Structures are given as C-alpha cells and as structure tokens.
C-alpha cells in the first residue's frame, strides 16, 4: 500500500458556494451577476420608478463571461440576486499539446495542463503567436466550476 502515489488535484475547492447574495439595487455596471443560471458581466442596467402597487424594478442586461451570450432579467430592487465569485489569473504559456491542451505555468512555478485551447479567433491567434515563438501570458477566468482562457497578451516581463 505504501508504494501507491497519493493523487494530487490541482483545482480543488473548499466546497463553499460558488455565489453570494447581493441586493439588486446594490449591483453596478461592469459587476458580475448570475442571470438564467450563468455567470454574467453587467453591461446595461436601468431602474424603473416605483408603481402604485409595488417596488422599483431593475432591468439587467449581462454578457456570459464564458460564451459571450446575452442574458436579460427584470427584478424588484429589494430582491436578492446571486453574484458569482470570479477569479482571474495570469499564466505563462509554455506549450500546446497535439490534442489542443495548453501547458500553463503559474507565478509560483506550478504547471497545469487541464485547459483546452479556446475556440474561435482567440484560439487561432494564440496558436499562431505561440508557433511564431512569442512569449505569451494567458488570462484564465474561473467561476461556478468553469474555467477558460479569455485573453492572451505578449509577456513583456521577460524582455527586460
């Protein structure tokens, strides 16, 4: 039994909730909110006046932070909305495997190989820049159990 290696999971969490409640009236543009069960960035927000029978309503428009889809919702300003915990981290790209997985290195030197190359223009640009020998930093967004590369930039720290 002693010769069996312990399994080590890079992306474990404490089991805490992926969201926290916030009153609708306290939400702000460019903040995050859960719309239709998806983590979204608020791009538009408007408030209607209090009616004869009821609360002021807040109209929210958000863009899904992972797939770019637009979601809308209308809720009373006193209503509590779920706000996702969003973590943003930069990793240095060290390799791209044949099956499309990225090898990323964190600031502390830890390697991770569990993220696929993003779809669309971003993935195409990432691969062509890497193939041309550029040092790249990948920005990874993590929320609600999902992770994906959302941006790529040249690593200027190595030029000094």
Curated annotation (Swiss-Prot):
PROSITE patterns documented for this protein: IF5A_HYPUSINE (PS00302)
Give the domain of life: Eukaryota
**Where found in the cell?**
Cytoplasm
Swiss-Prot/TrEMBL GO biological process terms: positive regulation of translational elongation; positive regulation of translational termination
**GO-annotated cellular components:** cytoplasm
Q: Which UniProt keywords apply?
A: Cytoplasm, Elongation factor, Hypusine, Protein biosynthesis, RNA-binding
Spell out the Pfam families in the cross-references. eIF-5a, IF5A-like_N
Q: Which residues form a coiled coil?
A: none
Record-listed Hypusine modification sites: 52
Q: What is its main location?
A: cytoplasm
Q: How is it modified after translation?
A: Lys-52 undergoes hypusination, a unique post-translational modification that consists in the addition of a butylamino group from spermidine to lysine side chain, leading to the formation of the unusual amino acid hypusine. eIF-5As are the only known proteins to undergo this modification, which is essential for their function.
Supply the CDD domains for this chain.
S1_eIF5A
Q: Which purpose does this protein serve, as stated in its record? A: Translation factor that promotes translation elongation and termination, particularly upon ribosome stalling at specific amino acid sequence contexts. Binds between the exit (E) and peptidyl (P) site of the ribosome and promotes rescue of stalled ribosome: specifically required for efficient translation of polyproline-containing peptides as well as other motifs that stall the ribosome. Acts as a ribosome quality control (RQC) cofactor by joining the RQC complex to facilitate peptidyl transfer during CAT tailing step.
Family to which the UniProt record says this protein belongs: Belongs to the eIF-5A family.
What protein am I looking at? Eukaryotic translation initiation factor 5A
Source organism of this protein record: Spodoptera frugiperda
What phylogenetic lineage does the species belong to?
Eukaryota, Metazoa, Ecdysozoa, Arthropoda, Hexapoda
